[in-house]
């Protein structure tokens, strides 16, 4: 196994993450599964001197109104990227991350399908556009490739300048 891309995520809207059930569900998908899957494929990745790319979110670096579990789980994913980058390096495995900004996905439909909300979101992004799957793929390919052979434990922010 050369590359393992971990790109799972869920969110609970309408303040559901403030309840135990919503919190636990989001944490299980967005954070716990990252560790479990990384551990499961560690030996295979080590045999190939492979690479893991953990997709988190810009929400892991800033507050996310109404979604505390989502923000905390993505912050945890960023920290896990650092920790696994250090822990797995001796096995020849590089672990890096990707923190997307606004990309049109199932999880962002609440914004992308509301013209007023979308306009407000785009106004905060210096490039004045959403990211695309191709934008994210390019960054992931770089992190997984030999071009990033001396990079581990780092999360690359790909957000059109939103975090500036």
Question: Which residues make up each language-model segment?
Answer:
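Substrate-binding pocket helix/loop in short-chain dehydrogenase/reductase
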Residues: 14-27, 121
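Residue(s) in the substrate-gating loop at a strand-loop-helix junction
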Residues: 57
């Amino acid at each position: 196994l050369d590359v393992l891309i971990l790109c799972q995520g869920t969110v609970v809207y309408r303040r559901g993450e403030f309840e135990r059930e919503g919190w636990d569900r989001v944490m299980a998908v967005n954070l716990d599964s990252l560790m479990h899957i990384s551990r499961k494929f560690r030996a295979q990745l080590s045999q190939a001197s492979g690479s893991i790319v953990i997709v988190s979110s810009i929400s892991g670096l800033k507050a996310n109104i109404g979604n505390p579990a989502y923000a905390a789980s993505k912050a945890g994913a960023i920290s896990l990227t650092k920790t696994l980058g250090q822990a797995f390096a001796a096995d020849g495995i590089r672990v890096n991350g990707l923190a997307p900004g606004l990309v049109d996905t199932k999880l962002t439909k609440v914004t992308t399908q509301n013209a007023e909300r979308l306009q407000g979101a785009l106004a905060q992004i210096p490039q004045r556009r959403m990211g695309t799957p191709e934008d994210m793929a390019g960054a992931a390919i770089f992190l997984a490739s030999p071009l990033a052979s001396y990079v581990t434990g780092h999360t690359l922010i790909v957000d059109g300048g939103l975090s500036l």
